[in-house]
Structures are given as C-alpha cells and as structure tokens.
C-alpha cells in the first residue's frame, strides 16, 4: 500500500519524502514546486507522496481517478507547507487560500486558477464518492502544523499529529472501498500512525540536521539525553536505547492495527498486507543496525522485499507475523 522509495528503502506516512527524484531520503526532493496557475497534474500513478498508501497495480481501475485526485490534493499541500526557504507566514497564507479552494470543491464552486488542476478532479471525486471533506481538511491542519514545527512534548502530542497527517489517508481509502466499520477504521489509524512513526525513526539522521525533530522530548528525557546529543554521539548507549524504545512503540502500534490486513477482502486487503509487513521489516532493519538510526538510515535489499512478499502472502487473521531479522 505504501510505495517503495527509489533508494531501496520504503515509503511510509511521514513528512520525510515522497517527491520524485533523488535518493537522499529527505522526501526524495530535488526541488519541489508549488502548483502554478492553471497547473494540471499529469495522470501518474500514486507513487511519490509519502503519506499515500497505494500500490497502483492493486488499486481497482474505477477508483484510480479518485485516488489520484486525493494524491494531488495532498501532494500540492505538502509542497506548499515545505517550500524551501519561503517564509512560514507566506506558506501559511497559501495554505489558507488552498483551504478556501477545498471548501469550493466541496460545494461544487469553481476553484481559483492557481490550483484548478488539483481541485477540479477532487471536486469530481468528492461528488462521485461522497468523500468525507473533514478528512481532507484534517490533512491541511497537519500541513499547517508543519509550518510551525516546534517538536513534540510527548507521545500523545505526536500521535495527535499523526491523527491528522496520516490517519485521514487510510480512512479516505477505506471509504473509497466502501469499508466503514469502526473497528477497521481504528485498525487503519493504528497502521497509518505506526508507518508514520517508522518513517520518523528511520530518518533521524536526515531529519534532525534539517530542523525536523519528531522525537518526543519526554522519551529523550527518559534516557537522560536530547536529540542534539544523540546526533553528536549517534552510537552512544543512550542514543541506541532511545531508538530501541521508539521502535518498540511503533511496532506495538503496528501489531495493534495489523489484523485489518487479512480481515479485509480483495485488492485492498492484499495491499494492506504488504504495508504491514513492509513496516515491520523496516523495524527489523533498524534492529539489525543495533538501533543506530541517529547515524544512518536503514536500507531494504532484494531479500527484504522477498521476505515482505512471503510474509504478506502467509498472513493470517490471528498471526500478523512480525518481521524479525532473518
């Protein structure tokens, strides 16, 4: 469900990658652009946005236009929120304008020329599938928070962010597949949040030097350290112990949501199997590095992808099969 990065790692819900191009790991960004006036997104498969759970070959053809529309909505907002050296106030103003166009799309009014290529398809998707607009609005809340990024005091604060930056995507895709069961929604939230956390913990060596600190301060304090100290001594016992605890948290959350994968029938269920096993495999790779994520980023290789596939194929409702080191 979540695409693989071009650097042989995995794409999960995060604010860390997702644009086409390089292998640096930081959102695969070369230099991303806010959609220009009259911008018309090309009909690509949904394979570049980090918060997007999609493997296009598993997406039913009838749903692909709506999935693309949601993708371009999220990707363009992501571009605005993380537009290089643009002042935060400017990005916030652009996101406010973007939110106005979302409201217009929801009511069938014409969007502004600037993002017409984004909102015309989205308006059609909203109309055709009765997309829950509050979920789209929640994504914008998260992007606005990104422009004010000041870190997170504790796990509850970070999970609150995930509830707006990651969980809405899972719920939108469940909605498109006609899945509205509350239990499935809770499990989807757990999987999406877990994937977001996994991406944070695999990208510590990349994000922190760029001013993006997602480590809850309470977790760092519990190990009598700070993220700045961990960057200076990435292989110190406290640094590794901190990553170990963070990965255990992400794994627990993933296993909480994992039963959704074998429980959901059809293509989306198979997609979810790969999502769950991919996330667990990344955690296993971090463990194989002795939790040295402050020093470097884990990478998946061909054997890892084979293991992900095998474990996805053999998942059972009562056996999520956590991906341990082979």
Each predicted region: which residue ranges?
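Short, low-complexity intrinsically disordered segments enriched in A/P/G/S/L with frequent Arg
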Residues: 11-14, 21-26, 31-35
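Extreme N-terminal basic, low-complexity initiation segments
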Residues: 1-10
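Catalytic cores of Mg2+-dependent Asp-rich isoprenoid enzymes
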Residues: 4, 30-195, 201-326
């Amino acid at each position: 469900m979540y695409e693989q990065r071009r650097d042989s790692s995995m794409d999960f819900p995060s604010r860390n990658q997702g644009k086409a191009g390089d292998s640096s790991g930081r959102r695969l960004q070369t230099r991303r652009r806010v959609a220009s006036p009259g911008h018309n997104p090309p009909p690509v498969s949904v394979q570049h946005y980090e918060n997007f759970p999609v493997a296009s070959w598993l997406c039913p053809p009838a749903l692909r236009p709506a999935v693309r529309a949601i993708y371009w909505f999220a990707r363009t907002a992501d571009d605005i929120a993380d537009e290089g050296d643009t002042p935060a106030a400017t990005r916030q103003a652009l996101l406010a304008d973007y939110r106005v166009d979302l409201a217009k799309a929801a009511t069938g009014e014409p969007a502004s020329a600037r993002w017409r290529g984004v909102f015309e398809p989205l308006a059609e998707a909203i109309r055709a599938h009765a997309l829950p607009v509050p979920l789209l609005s929640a994504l914008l809340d998260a992007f606005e928070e990104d422009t004010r990024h000041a870190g997170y005091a504790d796990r509850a604060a970070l999970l609150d962010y995930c509830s707006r930056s990651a969980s809405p995507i899972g719920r939108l895709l469940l909605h498109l597949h006609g899945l509205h069961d509350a239990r499935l929604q809770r499990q989807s939230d757990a999987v999406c949040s877990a994937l977001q956390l996994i991406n944070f913990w695999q990208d510590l060596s990349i994000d922190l030097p760029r001013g993006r600190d997602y480590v809850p301060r309470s977790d760092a304090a519990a190990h009598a350290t700070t993220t700045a100290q961990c960057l200076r001594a990435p292989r110190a016992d406290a640094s590794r112990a901190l990553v170990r605890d963070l990965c255990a948290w992400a794994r627990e959350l993933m296993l909480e949501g994992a039963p959704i994968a074998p429980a959901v029938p059809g293509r989306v269920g198979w997609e979810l199997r790969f999502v769950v096993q991919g996330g667990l495999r990344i955690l296993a790779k971090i463990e194989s590095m002795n939790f040295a994520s402050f020093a470097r980023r884990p990478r998946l290789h061909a054997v890892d992808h084979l293991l992900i596939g095998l474990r996805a194929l053999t998942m059972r409702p009562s056996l999520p099969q956590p991906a341990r080191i082979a």
